[in-house]
Amino acid sequence: MPVITLPDGSQRHYDHPVSPMDVALDIGPGLAKATIAGRVNGELVDASDLIENDATLSIITAKDEEGLEIIRHSCAHLLGHAIKQLWPHTKMAIGPVVDNGFYYDVDLDRTLTQEDVEALEKRMHELAEKNYDVIKKKVSWHDARETFVKRGETYKVAILDENIAHDDKPGLYHHEEYVDMCRGPHVPNMRFCHHFKLMKTAGAYWRGDSNNKMLQRIYGTAWADKKALNAYLQRLEEAAKRDHRKIGKQLDLYHMQEEAPGMVFWHNDGWTIFRELEVFVRSKLKEYQYQEVKGPFMMDRVLWEKTGHWDNYKDAMFTTSSENREYCIKPMNCPGHVQIFNQGLKSYRDLPLRMAEFGSCHRNEPSGALHGLMRVRGFTQDDAHIFCTEEQIRDEVNACIRMVYDMYSTFGFEKIVVKLSTRPDKRIGSDEMWDRAEADLAVALEENNIPFEYQLGEGAFYGPKIEFTLYDCLDRAWQCGTVQLDFSLPSRLSASYVGEDNERKVPVMIHRAILGSMERFIGILTEEFAGFFPTWLAPVQVVVMNITDSQSEYVNELTQKLQNAGIRVKADLRNEKIGFKIREHTLRRVPYMLVCGDKEVEAGKVAVRTRRGKDLGSLDVNDVIEKLQQEIRSRSLQQLEE
C-alpha cells in the first residue's frame, strides 16, 4: 500500500489507494479546499486520481503556475458547456490553454456577434456560480468514440480516430450534462473558475490547414482571483494605449499597405530612429571588435540546398529566376558570412573572426500572422557570426553575453530571463563535443553571475544555444537575443582554417543576435516608451518657438546654433498662440520645447519646457546646448532636471 512522500520530506502511510484530494484532506480541510490537482512523481494528475504505489506528491493550488493553467483549461470546458446550452448544435473542436488564457474552436452555423459573446460570457458565469463538481471518467477508446458519435461531435471523433491509440483510455470530463475529452487535469469543482472574461473571436482553420473548414475561435482570459483579472485587464488597456501601430501613425513614423504586405514604408521620423539605432549598434560593434560586412540579397538556390535551408525552410523563402537559374531571397545571413570567410586562406591566428551585418532578410510569413513591426516579411537583423576554435568558444560566448546586457541596459531593460537549450535526440557531433559546448555556455553564464534555466532537448541539431528574453514595463516577454553554437554549417559550406599543426580544421560558428530584428525592436521600444523616446533616439529632439513675429530672427539663429551642435531641431514660426504650439509638440512627444519671448531675446536666453510639462525656467543658451549634448552623447534615459 502506498507511502506518500510530501515536498517537506515527511511521509504518510496508507493501507489503501489514495487520491491527492484524500491526502490534502488528511493534512487539513483548508488545504483540501484549495486543492486543484496533484503532482505525482513529477506528473500532473487530477485531484481524484488514485495513487496505488509509493510516490512523491505535491498538492497543486491556485497559487501555483500549474494551478492557474488548470483553471484556464477548465474555463475552456466551461465555455463549451455554455455554448452548447445556448446553441446546442455547435460542434466542439479543440480548447487549449494559451498565454494568459484559453480559446475554443467551434463549428457554429452563425457568425458570433459581440452581443453573442456577451451572452456566452454571462451564461458561463451563471454556470460557474453553481459551483458544480467536475466528474472525470476514464473510458475505453470505443466508449469515448460512441459517446461523441451520439452527440454529433465530429471533431472529437476525428481526434480519437487520428490521434489516440485504440488501447488508450481517454479521460472524459463531465460538466453536468456537458461532456468534454481531455488529458487533464482539470479543477475538481467550478468554484475555482469564477474570474474570467471572453476577449475576442477570430477565424481558425481546423488543424491549421487552409484546405479544411474555417471555424470560429473564441478567446478568453482567466485568473485565480478578481484582483489578478482586473490587473491583467488594466495592463491590456495600457498596452492598447501603447500599441506601436497606433503611436506609429500618430507620430508619422511608418506605414504599411496592401501592395507590400509585411514590408515597412519608413517615413522620415521613423527612419531617423532606425538610423540612430544603427549608429548605437555600430558603436558597440567597434567596442567589441567586430568587422562589418554586407552580403547580397539573393543567392543561387544551390547554395541553400547545401546549407539544408532549402529542405527545411523553402516554404518560408521567396524565390525568383533569371537566365535559367533559380535564386532565393535570403531569409538569414549566415550562409553569406561563410562565403566571406571562405575568401582567402585563414590561419588559427586569424581567429576569432567576428563578422557583423545589418542584414536585410525576407521570410514568407503567413499573411494572418503579420502584425505591425512585430511580425513582418522584410526585416533587418543586427546579425553577427563569430568563427573560432573550440578552445575559444567560452571566451567568445562570455563577450557575447556582456554585449547583450550592455546593450539592453541602455534601453532600461532590467528583467531578462535566460534559457540554455541542450542537445536534442537527433543531432550531429559526438557526445564529448556536446558535453564541452553545453558546459562552455553554462560556465559563461555562471561567470557573468546570470541565473538561467535549462531547456532540455530544445537545442538545434547543430548546436546548443542561449536565449535572452527581455520583459517590458507591462511585464510582457520579448525573445530577442540568441547565442547559438553551430558545428554544422561551416562544414557544409567547406569553411576551414589552418591550425597550429598545419592541418586544415573546420571552425566553430557562433550565431549572435541581440536586438533580433531592427523593425521589431523599434516596435518594442515604441511600446516600452509609449512614443516618449529618450532624447538621443527622438526623431526631433528640440523645437524652438516664437511668441510673436519680433522673435523670429532670434529663433532662426538659435535653431542654426543647435543644428551646428549636432542636435535635431525644428523652428516653429507659425502665427499661432504659444499654448497651441506647446500642446501640439507635446502630443508629438518632442523632448524639449524652447520658447523665445522678448525677455529671452533681450537676455540672450531661452525658456525651456519638457514634453512632460516641466518648466525648467529661462536658461543660458550655451548651457542648454551643452546639457543637451551631454544627455544625447550619454544616451541617457532621463531628461534634464529629472
Curated annotation (Swiss-Prot):
Signal peptide bounds? none
* Protein's GO biological process: threonyl-tRNA aminoacylation
Question: Which EC number(s) does the record attach to this protein?
Answer: 6.1.1.3
Subcellular localization is given as: Cytoplasm
Q: Which domain of life is it from?
A: Bacteria
Does the entry feature the keyword Nucleotide-binding, yes or no?
Answer: yes
- Primary place of residence? cytoplasm
Q: Which UniProt keywords apply?
A: Aminoacyl-tRNA synthetase, ATP-binding, Cytoplasm, Ligase, Metal-binding, Nucleotide-binding, Protein biosynthesis, RNA-binding, tRNA-binding, Zinc
CDD domains referenced in this protein's UniProt entry, alphabetically? TGS_ThrRS, ThrRS_anticodon, ThrRS_core
- For region Catalytic, the annotated ranges are 243-534
Query: Quick check: keyword Zinc in the entry?
Result: yes
* NCBIfam families referenced in this protein's UniProt entry, alphabetically: thrS (TIGR00418)
- Spell out the subunit comment: Homodimer.
Which protein, by its recorded name, is this? Threonine--tRNA ligase
Recorded source organism is: Salmonella typhimurium (strain LT2 / SGSC1412 / ATCC 700720)
